[in-house]
Amino acid sequence: MAGYGLPNEKHLSVVLQRNLVSEGHNIEVVNGSVSGSTSAGGLNIAEWTLSEPDIDLMILCLGANDMLRGINPKETKSNLEEIIKIAKDKNIKVIIAGMIAPTSYGLNYKKTFDKIFSDLAKIYELQLVPFLLEGVAQKPEFNLSDGM
């Protein structure tokens, strides 16, 4: 997650790096995200981004902007699947972070979108974070003024 509107020290990648190092891990967390990016945008840069040497793990956090734009969940799933394949071809482990669509998009859209992440985790034997924004979503103190 790019951390749009957050000070740098509160970006997910920075907090993750700080926490892992404080636990004694010798690790570097690199933020490869782009604010506003969709799964298609992520797919466009995946080969290049994942060509860096010594990448052991990727946390895949794409799909939320697809949902906000009403992109067909089948397209989102296909793009995420291609990103996973690129990572796997490079022997990069993948953790996939899920998102949840609101009911305002309709129950069919919500059902189809919400299943993307667990389906891909099962197919590719990935570790799944069911809802990345658990404990953050719908809490005004953790969101932008527009509620996002």
Task: Please give the residue ranges for each predicted region.
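Serine-esterase "nucleophile elbow" of acetyl-processing enzymes
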Residues: M1-S37, I45-D54
